[in-house]
């Protein structure tokens, strides 16, 4: 390979694709305006708030039906967002987010990442949520939603992975500077490692 830093490029682009496909799906939809979410920032905030709720329900091993999602949106709207929408609108909004934006109305989603080893694009499948049939009170049949591995990777990359990997990332950068013989930058990076260690030790003693 001509450039070693382009190794495993499709894997990098898969992570980029998780954001790109989601943004593309959302920006192309005009239905947001009927719910009062005209700004792109508002739309993305609500999408991720809904994904976090689905993740929370999954982690607690509790059902996550469209009624649950609608009630959740209605609650955060009443308390925080203050859009002029009813509970029924909140439920429709939840259905729109989960089944249209996150699920692409049942159509498969893909993102292409170029493989510089094979001189060709890799077509990578992307899926944020999945569902299963559950029975409430052993009789009522409902669809319950949960995050896929891609969904977890996307959500966790927004905060949890960064928080837990800060020290490791700085160690990786330090190693990369050494490999490139950028010794001055390596010294700066090891200082960052020590600073993070001091912060973590300080928190442990609080």
Set out the residue ranges of the language-model regions.
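Short, glycine/acidic-rich hinge or "gate" loops at secondary-structure transitions
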Residues: 66, 84-91
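A structured, charge-rich N-terminal accessory region that forms the first stable segment of a protein
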Residues: 12-46, 52, 71
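Eukaryotic basic, amphipathic alpha-helical target segments in cytosolic regions
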Residues: 58, 77-80, 105
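DNA-recognition alpha helix
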Residues: 65-82
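Extended alpha-helical scaffolds
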Residues: 129-205
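Positively charged, polyanion-binding regions of nucleic-acid-associated proteins
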Residues: 41-66, 95, 174, 178-203
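Charged low-complexity interaction tracts in eukaryotic proteins
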Residues: 3-31, 92-160
């Amino acid at each position: 390979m001509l450039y070693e830093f382009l190794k495993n490029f499709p894997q990098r682009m898969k992570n980029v694709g998780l954001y790109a496909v989601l943004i593309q799906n959302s920006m192309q939809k005009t239905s947001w305006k009927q719910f009062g979410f005209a700004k792109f920032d508002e739309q993305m905030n609500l999408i991720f708030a809904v994904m976090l709720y689905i993740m929370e329900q999954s982690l607690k091993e509790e059902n996550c039906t469209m009624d649950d999602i609608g009630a959740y949106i209605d609650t955060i709207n009443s308390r925080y967002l203050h859009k002029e929408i009813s509970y029924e609108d909140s439920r429709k909004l939840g259905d729109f987010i989960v089944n249209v934006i996150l699920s692409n109305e049942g159509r498969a989603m893909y993102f292409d990442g170029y493989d510089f080893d094979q001189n060709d694009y890799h077509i990578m499948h992307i899926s944020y949520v999945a569902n299963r049939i559950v029975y409430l009170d052993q009789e009522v049949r409902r669809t319950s939603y949960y995050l896929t591995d891609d969904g977890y990777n996307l959500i966790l990359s927004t905060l949890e992975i960064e928080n837990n990997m800060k020290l490791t990332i700085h160690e990786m950068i330090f190693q990369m500077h050494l490999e490139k013989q950028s010794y001055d930058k390596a010294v700066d990076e090891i200082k960052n490692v020590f600073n993070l260690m001091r912060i973590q030790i300080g928190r442990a003693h609080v």
